[in-house]
Structure formats: structure tokens, C-alpha cells
């Protein structure tokens, strides 16, 4: 052809040169497509300088794919105009772990249900439903108790009149010898309701006079045998029953009581059993063990068996143990030579609720039992109700209960602000209990509230401040001053309690909290929610909602006991948890009119010193500073950071264990894990905390797969082309390495410019 040797030389501008398309490798086709679009976007011409609205935005690149820059144009710029402003579109710090510090007061979900916020002072005081009777005729003597025991109750225990359930049960159990089921609300005195008839009957067996031996001593003494057994679900409840029983038996010193519970040495328990006991308080597991392995335990004379907290006994899985205990007591029962002792055994079942599990326990242990309630006049009305309504729990009428809808990020600061306000004035509240869901959360919050505080000026506490904040002696680390919400005029002591602590530590901590005369707070799990009668508890805070409505009843039942006033507050999160308010209302006789709502912002304002009436936002700054200080404290101490992560993980696992009927209100899929992590002073992404039991999302699974694939491909390339890596010299620091890399790139670019046309 004639035109084969034709050469054309066109003069084109820099902007008209068609640059070769950059080929992207690695990743999925979706990622390559998005990276290709990003490259085309940057290949467009620059925007006008005066167009502020068209300022380029940072491209969204969640997978952080490095987009290679385009090849240089025909000639390099030598004027140095805007070359220094060009920045790499990659992420230079992508290999370093990123921490995100989110604001406390932004992007928080709003409550779905807007209700009127009532002040607690506007709530009418209700008549106590579990208080002692004020009628002068209803005394312990009129119920059938001996004058000696009634006088002991009046003078030593300062009990002037019985409660409604005590009046109904004492008269019934002293009059008849049949089985009984005692049902009453929490804090109404059920322990004395069955202990007083028990002690009265054993005292009648040993009454001086005709029933004495040759020396004039009562026939019944510690060697006479075991007459009564009291079973309780927890060790703490057994200890409390034992203390009440010992106080009662001070008027009958010849009757001996003892305990056998888990966590103590069996050798010492066997020694006590060999010496002889008349009344035994035990946990089901340890009693079943002694019945099988201890020959000194003689149960042939046992005529009274009490099952306290029957619903909890079934929830903890003691059905088989109790069934075995009842069978062994029936098989080993023998006629007694002691005059006046009943021919058959009397079984008493106590429970605040009447659930199917309690009914099943009654079928195992009770025979023709009488149902004892505090309000017998309402029996006909209750009989017409359905079974679900029969088993509904009731809250003491004098208990002032409220709830606060708090966003996940604000939970920790709101709890701190609430107790700052609570203990601002000395004497307003003496004792309070905080219930959380798991033991790891107890340990973390205990360390947060007892850590060394940083002054507002940023300095460390002085020696005088340290001397004023000396904690009480606690060799086990369960007692410390609550520096987070103490003040110079009202120091507060913090106690911690959970089931993972050794038994001796749990007993000593609980005893120290009960005996403390100053302001104190107990942070604990549900191990302290059942049956414990802790004196002067004015406030109960459910920081984590209970796993069932019955557990909620027992939690708030630690206050407002035996006619005393009490307050309770529960924390709920916006969303599906707000439906739990209807469950709370069902526990009231008036349909929940006494249930009030507390505003979370008002709690923060009052706690962090802001003026509620004005629009000043100083309280937000103080709350944010306090939260950031806790987060820095956790980051600076690896031990506490690991403790926070464990608490977060355990909290998520515990959140998924709500009962099936309430799981729609506590849906783990609707939890914002990132916001919730901030309540544990964590700045890590939840995906990096590795929460066991949670499935990874699609994006996280895809990232993990690509990371493994890229690492494997990198190893292959490194094995096959190790000599290429030697072209880039190594450096000791990042700055030197970057400088040498730029020099290497200039060499490659200089070689490419030699082949430019024109």
C-alpha cells in the first residue's frame, strides 16, 4: 500500500491525551467496579475555585481499596503551582487500629412513647400493704404464742404487732397440723410466719413440768434429735434465716439450730451434726449429700419441713434433690418416744407467686395443703380470675417506683448523675442497691466508681484528700469508697457482691453492708435479690432489667419492707424496651397509676450541677468530660480495659437470656452495640471486641474472607518474588522509608518521560 509509510504528527494539548485505563486487581467485582468509578471521578478536570458548593467530598470507600494514581501526562509541571496540594487518596493509617470517640448527645434514639413526666413528690402516699397491724387486739399473744415468746418479740426484737400474713399463718399452723402453702408479697414477713409456729411447737415439747428428766432439765435438748428442716435456694438466704432463728431461740437456749450450706467444709458440718441439732437450715444440694454420706444425720424425728422461696427452688433446678429428700424423710421416719410430738410430718411451702413450677413442687411435697394468704376476704374474687392473673405478682403499695428511658451511650453517666444527686445531702438516703446482669459487669462498675478521681484542674489528689478517702478494711477487695458520687460532707462506701466470689467473702461483705451505719451502696447480681432482709435499704436501682417479671419483684422487694417507705428505679432503652412498662404496671393493684417516669436529661442536669430552669448546657460539658475521663482511665490501664471488654461481652450474653415471654421487649438484634460499648468506656468497634455468641454480619464475614485470601496471596507472591522486595531498601522508621520510596518513584517517572512524543 502506498500509505503504509505515511507518518502523521499532530500537535495536541495536554488535556486531549487519552490516558490508558488503570487495571485494578484483587477484591470482588463489586469492589473493583466502585474503585473504577472513583478513579474516573478523580480523572475529571478540576472545579472552579469560586464554586464553594461543588467542593469535592471524600469518596466512600468502606473496604479501603488503594486506587493507583494515573500515569503522568506529557510533561511534568515545573512551576510547582498546586503540586504540593495533591494528596494521596489512600489511607496512610489504615494499618493502625482506629478508635472512634463519639459524642454523648448526638445520634441518640428518641423515646417512642412520650408520657408525662411526674415528680415523685406529686405521687400520693399509699397505705402500706405489708406493714404490721395497728389494731391493738391483734397481738402475738392473741394469736396463740406463749407469753414468754411474745415478750421476747416485744422486748428484744422490738416487734409489737404481726403483719397480715403472720396473723393468718401463725393462727392456722398452731391450730392444725396439716400441710400449708403460704403466699404473700415480698417483704411481708414470711420468715417469721413459719418460724414462730415452729419454735412455739418445739418449745411446747420441752416445757418444764411433767416433761422433765430426773435432774429437772427439759426433755428436749440438742441430743434429742432433729425436729425441723428449713430448705432455702441460696446460701445468703440460709444465713439470714439462721440469724433470725438464733435471735428467736435466745428465749429458749436449750433448742439448738445450725446450717449446712455449700461452700463450707463438710468436716466442720459433720462435727456440728454429731453434736446434735434440733432445727437445721440447709440448701437442697448439701442436705442431699449429707443424707447419703453422713451417718450422724438422723432424720427419724423430723416432723416439720419448710420449703422457702419455692419458685426459686424450682428455677435453680432443685426438683430432683427435693424429691429425693422427701422420699428419704418418708422412708426414715420412725415413731418418737418424746411425748407431744406429731405422728406425721408437716410440710410448709412458701412463695410470693403461684406459678406452674410452684404447683408442681406442691404436688411433690404437699398433701391436702391449706392455702394461706394475707387477704382471705378477697378469696372469692380471686377465684374468678384466670390462672395467669392468679399467678400475677404484687408490688407493695408504699413503694414508689419509676422508670427512665436512657439511650445506650448515656447509661453510665446517667447512673453516676443519679447517685451524685441522691447522696448530695447527708441523711437523704442511707443504703441503696444496684442490680446488674452479670458478675463481670459488677467488677467493672465497682472499679469505675471507686477509681482515683482527677480534679477539675487536672491535678492529682493531694495527700489530705487521700487520707480522707481511706476505705474501710477490706482484705478481699469488695469494699471501697465510692469516689464517683461521694462528696466531702457525705462519703459513700461501695460494696460488690456476686456468685463468683468465695462463700466467706460473700458472707463477710453482706454482713458489712448490713451493719454499716453510713451511706453505702451495694452493686450486685441477682444473688442478693431473693429473701434477704437488709436493713434500711431506701433505694433499689435496676441498671439492667431483670430476666423475668418475678425476678423484678424480688429485686425491688429489698426495699419498702414491713411497712417502710422505699423507692425503685429501672433503666430502659428507647425502642422495644419501652413496652416493658406495661409489665411493670401489671404489678400494681391500681393498674400502675403509682408508676412514674423520670426524664433522663433532668437526671443529668441535677447530677452534674446544671441549672434545670435555665437553658445552660454546662451539664452536657461536665457529663462529657466525666465520660472521656473514664475512657482515658480504661485506655491507660490494660487491666481495666480488659475488664471493660469482658463486662461488655458478658452483658451481651446475659441480655439474650430473657424469658421467652419478654424476649420481644429485649430483642438483642435491636441493640446498638456501638452505643452500648460506650457505656462500658470502650472506644473499640464492637466487631473488634469479639463478642462470643453473636453472628458476624455479612460485611464483617466478607472482610474476614478477603483478608485471609489476600494474606495467602501475599505469601505466595513473597515466596515467588523475594528479589523484587530487595529493590526497596529497608528503613528503621516510617519517615525514612517514605522518603526513599518517593526517590524510587521519581526514577521510574524520569525514565518514562524519555519516550514522550512531540
UniProtKB/Swiss-Prot annotation:
Keywords: ATP-binding, Helicase, Hydrolase, Nucleotide-binding, Nucleus, Ribosome biogenesis, RNA-binding, rRNA processing. CDD domains: DEADc_DDX31, SF2_C_DEAD. Residues 398-620 form the Helicase C-terminal domain. Its EC number is 3.6.4.13. It catalyses: ATP + H2O = ADP + phosphate + H(+). GO terms for cellular component: nucleolus; nucleus. PROSITE patterns: HELICASE_ATP_BIND_1, HELICASE_CTER, Q_MOTIF. Residues 35-45 have a biased composition (Basic residues). Residues 171-372 form the Helicase ATP-binding domain. ATP-binding RNA helicase involved in the biogenesis of 60S ribosomal subunits and is required for the normal formation of 25S and 5.8S rRNAs. The Q motif is unique to and characteristic of the DEAD box family of RNA helicases and controls ATP binding and hydrolysis. This is ATP-dependent RNA helicase dbp7.
